[in-house]
Amino acid sequence: MILELDCGNSFIKWRVLDSGSASASAEGVVRSDLALIENLSALPRLLLTRCRLVSVRALEETSKLVEALHEAFGVTVSCAAPAREMAGVRNGYEDFERLGLDRWLAMLGGFKLARGACLVLDFGTAATADFIAADGEHLGGFICPGMPLMRNQLRTHTRKIRYDDAAAERALERLSPGRTTVEAVERGCTLMLRGFVLTQLELARSYWGDDFTVFLTGGDADLVVDAVPQAELVPDLVFVGLAMACPLS
C-alpha cells in the first residue's frame, strides 16, 4: 500500500492506494500530524510499504512528520522537491525553488491531463492561478487570499462579525444580496473568488483563444465550479503531479 500526503498550510490531505492501483482505498483530511497517525492507525489491515508527500510547511515541521510516519509504520518517505523542468513543464519563476510545491505539482498534473495549454486554478487557504502553454512553458501565475483567509480576516478585524461554520454553509445556498452579516460576508467572499476566476479566464483567452483546458482543484473549488462550466474539477490534481515527481515503481 502507498500513502500519499499533501501537507498544506491548514490541513493534511491523505489517501492510501493499493499497490498497482491508482484509486484510493481510503482517504481523508486532518488538521494535525497526530490526527493523521490516528486516522491511519484506525484503518483495518493497513500495511504501508511506501509513502510520498508534498509539503508547503517549514522544513522542521515536515521532518517531524516524516519521522513520525517512520516510527509509526516503518515506512520510508519520499518528498517532492522543486525542479526547473519536469515532465515537459518548465518552471516559470525567476527562482524556481520559490514556487510553491503544491502549485508545481498541480501544474504537472494539469499539463499531463490536458496534453496542451491549461489554466490551473487551486482554491485552498490561498487561491492560485497558473498558466501553462502548449509547449510546457509556465507563463507565471497569481496568488490571492482564499475563502478561509478572507473569512478569517473579517472575523478577526471586525468585532461584530461572528458566526459558525454551519451558518456559513447555509448562507451559501444562494448568492443574492445578504440580509444578515453571515450572508453578506460569505456571499461577498464567494463573489470575489468568482471574479478572480473570470479574470484568469479572460487572460487565458487572450493567450490561447479557446484552445486550452481549465482545471479546478482545492477544497473550495466547488464554490466556483458552476461559474466555469467548461472546467474540469479534479480534486486530486496535486496527487497526479506527486506521482510524477516521486515515482515509486
UniProtKB/Swiss-Prot annotation:
Binding site for K(+): 122
Cell location: Cytoplasm
Disulfide bonds: none
Cofactor details (free text): A monovalent cation. Ammonium or potassium.
Reactions catalysed according to its record: (R)-pantothenate + ATP = (R)-4'-phosphopantothenate + ADP + H(+)
Chief subcellular location: cytoplasm
Pathway entry: Cofactor biosynthesis; coenzyme A biosynthesis; CoA from (R)-pantothenate: step 1/5
Superkingdom of the organism of origin: Bacteria
Residues annotated as catalytic: 102 (proton acceptor)
Protein EC: 2.7.1.33
SUPFAM superfamilies: Actin-like ATPase domain
GO cellular component, one term: cytoplasm
Positions with a binding annotation for substrate: 93, 100-103, 181
UniProt GO BP: coenzyme A biosynthetic process
Keywords: ATP-binding, Coenzyme A biosynthesis, Cytoplasm, Kinase, Metal-binding, Nucleotide-binding, Potassium, Transferase
PANTHER family: TYPE III PANTOTHENATE KINASE (PTHR34265:SF1)
Family: Belongs to the type III pantothenate kinase family.
Entries under HAMAP family matching the protein: Pantothen_kinase_3 (MF_01274)
Protein's name in the database: Type III pantothenate kinase
